[in-house]
Amino acid sequence: MQKRLTLLGSTGSIGDSTLDVVARHPERFAVHALTAHRNGEKLVAQCLRFAPDVAVVGDAETAARVEAQLRAAGSRTQVAYGKQALVDVSKSDGCDTVVAAIVGAAGLAPSLAAARAGKRILLANKEALVMSGAIFMDAVRDHGAILLPVDSEHNAIFQCMPRDAAEHGGIAKIIVTASGGPFRTREPATLASVTPDEACKHPNWVMGRKISVDSATMMNKGLEVIEAHWLFGLPSERIDVLIHPQSVIHSLVSYRDGSVLAQLGNPDMRTPIAHALAFPERVDAGVAQLDLAQIATLTFEKPDYARFPCLALAIDALEAGGVASAALNAANEIAVDAFLSRRIRFTAIAQTVGAVLDGLSNRTPGGLDDVIEADAAARRAATAFIGKLPAPGVERAA
């Protein structure tokens, strides 16, 4: 039976890769809804190619522009806008599968709506679990949703794990691999001077600018540790991080009998996307077969927490529980935006997140409202902290 998709965040890198796979298998996949924030031009092009029932954008002005272009081209795709429209297409009877690829906290509400509607969810938005892990997983369980990880690391772990629960599968630990990003070997004393463009030049993966910066700080890997905790039910002490610069081994599962299973492949997001889209079957993703003889060497090293303080901060937040992970994510989003806007130095990202966590009044969230409140409070605290920092290139007066 043909799967009908709602693709949240269709104009981003995950959206591009998803639609590439979808286009290869029109007999298997059809598109119910595509969503974007403000990239109307790209969304129009996608709508004309994939003919979704609905297109959703962030605001009325973009919606009017998109609708005018679609009507001029003869498209019947309906156009909606705003947060509620995202929720509506995520729980719509017109789709059975939701690809959650909106970057950041904005993806939480529609992803949660999909879970509560019992959808098959392909989760690329890690913030849904980072911010509200227990709430989200409860919704998945209580409403019979199917959750399939799209992040390459978590998809790899999923492929290497038995289908039963971790505690009954003889699992000792899971090992999340990381490339180390563009600054793995850079002298730490020079990190304060790196530019946004340098931070966004990932050595292996093609990604958006926000997640590229998260990779450079290794906050992305910290968020993935938190996500792995909720997806696979393992405590932080049974989740290791391993630097693997070639990005060929996407993650590993270590068993109590000494066996280690790993998932390998070329660094191309179409592979985990195709796996999740077609699961439990396999389909062509358009990705070249891995040639280990050509690669020849795979190397590994332990992460340097002094070089990557954001990784340590994320693990600390996971162990603290409560709303600490939500605060971590919110502060990081504010700090990364400030860095990309050249308002703070690269090294101030970790400083900002650390300051927000130090000032956090942690508590166990009673529901989604508590998570949203913690998110907002952390954003205010991060903004206030950044406001007191000197601009890049400006030293404080003695």
Swiss-Prot record:
Chain residues that bind 1-deoxy-D-xylulose 5-phosphate: 126, 152-153, 179, 202, 215, 220-221, 224
Annotated catalysed reactions: 2-C-methyl-D-erythritol 4-phosphate + NADP(+) = 1-deoxy-D-xylulose 5-phosphate + NADPH + H(+)
One example of a Gene Ontology biological process annotation: isopentenyl diphosphate biosynthetic process, methylerythritol 4-phosphate pathway involved in terpenoid biosynthetic process
Entry keyword Metal-binding: yes
Positions in coiled-coil regions: none
Pathway membership: Isoprenoid biosynthesis; isopentenyl diphosphate biosynthesis via DXP pathway; isopentenyl diphosphate from 1-deoxy-D-xylulose 5-phosphate: step 1/6
Keyword Transport: no
Entry cofactors: Mg(2+); Mn(2+)
EC number of the protein: 1.1.1.267
Binding site for Mn(2+): 151, 153, 224
Single GO molecular function: 1-deoxy-D-xylulose-5-phosphate reductoisomerase activity
Keyword tags: Isoprene biosynthesis, Manganese, Metal-binding, NADP, Oxidoreductase
Chain positions recorded as NADPH binding sites: 11-14, 38-39, 125, 127, 208
Family: Belongs to the DXR family.
Function: Catalyzes the NADPH-dependent rearrangement and reduction of 1-deoxy-D-xylulose-5-phosphate (DXP) to 2-C-methyl-D-erythritol 4-phosphate (MEP).
Protein name: 1-deoxy-D-xylulose 5-phosphate reductoisomerase
Organism: Burkholderia pseudomallei (strain K96243)
Gene: dxr
